[in-house]
C-alpha cells in the first residue's frame, strides 16, 4: 500500500512538472533577464517596491543602478497615472461608485539591442459612501496599494514577450542583412495594451 501511494505521488509530481504547470503569480522570466537593474525616479515609492518584490518572487537578482556592469538589462519605471471616473450615481446626483484606472509605463533596455516600451493598466471599482469618510479613505488606500501590486505583476508578465520580440527582431535583422546590402535602423515595437 505504501509503495502504491509513493508511486501515485511521484506520478502526480511528474505530470504537473511535465505539463508546464507552475505556481500562481509566478512568471517564467527569460534567463537573459535573471539579473537586472531596476531604475526608478522614486526608488522607495509604492510601484518600485511592488516591482522589486515581484522580481524577487520570480527569481530575478537585482543590481544597484550605479553598477559598473553595462551588459545587464534594465527595467526603467516611468510615469504612473491614476484616474477616477464616475461609474454610478445616487438619486440625488452624488457619485455612488468610481472606477479607478491606473496606467503604468515602463521600458526595458537590453544593452546592445533595443529599448522596449511596456505598459500596464489596472481597473478597480470603488464605492463612495459619503457618510463614512474615514473608512472610505482607508479603503481607497488599500485599493490603490492592490492596484500597484497588480500593475507590477502585469509588467513582470510582459518580460517573456520582450525576449520574444528581441529574438524576432534579431531574425529580421539577419534576414535583411542577407537580402540587401543596406539595412534600415531598427525600430522598437510597443508591447502591451
From Swiss-Prot:
Comp. bias intervals (Low complexity)? 174-186
| Key word Cytoplasm present | no
Gene3D superfamilies in UniProt: Lipoprotein like domain
- Stretch list, region Disordered: 166-193
Which residues are the lipid attachment points (N-palmitoyl cysteine)? 19
In this record, residues modified by a lipid of the kind S-diacylglycerol cysteine are 19
Q: Name one GO biological process term.
A: Gram-negative-bacterium-type cell outer membrane assembly
What keywords would UniProt list here?
Cell outer membrane, Lipoprotein, Membrane, Palmitate, Signal
Span of the secretion signal? 1-18
Q: Name one GO cellular component term.
A: transporter complex
Subcellular locations according to the entry: Cell outer membrane
**UniProt superkingdom:** Bacteria
Q: Which InterPro entries match?
A: LPS_assembly_LptE (IPR007485)
How does the protein's chain sit in the membrane according to the entry?
A: Lipid-anchor
**Chief location of this protein within or outside the cell:** membrane
Give each disulfide bond as a residue pair: none
Molecular function GO terms recorded: lipopolysaccharide binding
Q: Which family does it belong to?
A: Belongs to the LptE lipoprotein family.
Q: What is the protein's quaternary organization?
A: Component of the lipopolysaccharide transport and assembly complex. Interacts with LptD.
Query: What is the recorded function of this protein according to its Swiss-Prot or TrEMBL entry?
Result: Together with LptD, is involved in the assembly of lipopolysaccharide (LPS) at the surface of the outer membrane. Required for the proper assembly of LptD. Binds LPS and may serve as the LPS recognition site at the outer membrane.
Q: What is this protein called?
A: LPS-assembly lipoprotein LptE
Native organism is Escherichia fergusonii (strain ATCC 35469 / DSM 13698 / CCUG 18766 / IAM 14443 / JCM 21226 / LMG 7866 / NBRC 102419 / NCTC 12128 / CDC 0568-73)
